Amino acid sequence: MSLHLYNTLHRRVEPFEPLDPACPTMYVCGPTVYNYVHIGNARGPVVFGVLAALLRRRYGALRYARNITDVDDKINTAAQEQGVPISAITERFCAAYREDMKKLGVEPPDIEPEATAHMPQIIAMIEQLIERQHAYVAMEHVLFAVNSFADYGQLSRRDTEEMLAGARVEIAPYKRDPSDFVLWKPSSDQLPGWDSPWGRGRPGWHIECSAMAAAHLGETIDIHAGGIDLQFPHHENEIAQSRCAHGSSTFARVWMHNGMLNFEGAKMSKSLGNIETVHELVAKHPPEALRYALLSAHYRKPLDWSEALIAQSVRTLNRLYGTLRDLAAYPARAIIPGNIEAALDDDLNTPQALAELATLANEARIQLADTTHHAAAEVTTALTRLKAKLLGAGLALGLLQQTPEAWFSQGTNESDETHIQALIDARGAAKQARDFVRADAIRAQLAAEGIVLEDTPQGVRWMKQHT
């Protein structure tokens, strides 16, 4: 099966056919760096990171850009409230974002353009829009004339009245039409600004992505992706700007949108006070469990985020890593199974891929439990093959990329491990001396410290209990 993706523009699943099969292009909208990102903001990077890896396997190369918005009124407000320079806000939260994504197993994009480094390209694109009569200057602002673009609304499929009702549209006296949006606005001396033909100012949010995408990926790109909340007005405006500036019929050939996260059944929002940041979550839970949870529902569907979901993800990973630990005697290199690739080819069906991963682990456990009825060479071949597929399935999803020992000892340090091993040895000595009361007391002590013991034919194993 070839890769098929749901294209929001056409409202259907379509075969993916890149403009250049030697190197597809993909642009994903990144964060505005004024605070730590919440867990909903991580869904796109995780899911589209899986897609990026799939595209590299399929085509051998990929040009993947994910931007950083480092000029925005939210950033200005945060700096003012905290009494620090704007650069202190952007540098701090840009670094935090990269670190949080790394912990979630998100590979960095090939290109991570920052808006402030692309002012010449942004200004040049605005000049093109004015020259082509798709934009106008009014009271030191430059605005895009929505009525000049006949296809406006093709992505969100809204009429003008719906657009005005569904977005925070500023009704300003300098607008020719209420639906027109800002490309450039004036800056006071206290705000960041750049010299331009229209005076000192700064760009609107939408033009930044259009200019950066064109600068790094060209006037027409294969895939543009982001959260469903960006479909309108951000992505709709990107299409209008880009097509009008370049005089082209297509900006992005495939538009992909991931669904939003709900928290304990309610929409995640600052007003409800139920936002959970990635920064907080990776400090409390194994980051790989958060990644697993983000992949557990199809990317286009809403995902109900909860402590129960995280706990279930931890338990599942305990089983998967436990299987790999039991397969330690069988060296193997990762081989991505065909049914995993088929699941991902089906519009990134990660729930199906995770189900296939679980099936592989179950098959391995059955084989491990039934080694006496088969020749040793046959058992070795079968278990080595299953381990290779298990590792490969994990690789395709960005899971199982640490050793079982590292997974089970998360949250402990070398001193903790020495202490734990000493107690395990003491428990072993107590059992050998048939002092079972002492042995049980040691197990209880370790349990109170969050350490779970497992007695196996290979010896005592332990794991740090995670929530």
From Swiss-Prot:
Coiled-coil stretches: none
EC numbers, comma separated: 6.1.1.16
Reaction catalyzed: tRNA(Cys) + L-cysteine + ATP = L-cysteinyl-tRNA(Cys) + AMP + diphosphate
One GO cellular component term noted in the UniProt record for this chain: cytosol
Motif ('KMSKS' region): 267-271
Binding site for ATP: K270
GO biological process entries: cysteinyl-tRNA aminoacylation
GO molecular function: ATP binding; cysteine-tRNA ligase activity; zinc ion binding
Record localization: Cytoplasm
Residues involved in Zn(2+) binding: C29, C209, H234, E238
Motif ('HIGH' region): 31-41
InterPro entries attached to this UniProt entry: Cys-tRNA-ligase (IPR015803), Cys-tRNA-synt_Ia_DALR (IPR015273), Cys-tRNA/MSH_ligase (IPR024909), Rossmann-like_a/b/a_fold (IPR014729), tRNA-synt_1_cat_dom (IPR032678), tRNAsynth_Ia_anticodon-bd (IPR009080)
Family: Belongs to the class-I aminoacyl-tRNA synthetase family.
Quaternary structure and interacting proteins, as annotated: Monomer.
Name of the molecule in the record: Cysteine--tRNA ligase
Species, as recorded: Xylella fastidiosa (strain Temecula1 / ATCC 700964)
Name of encoding gene: cysS
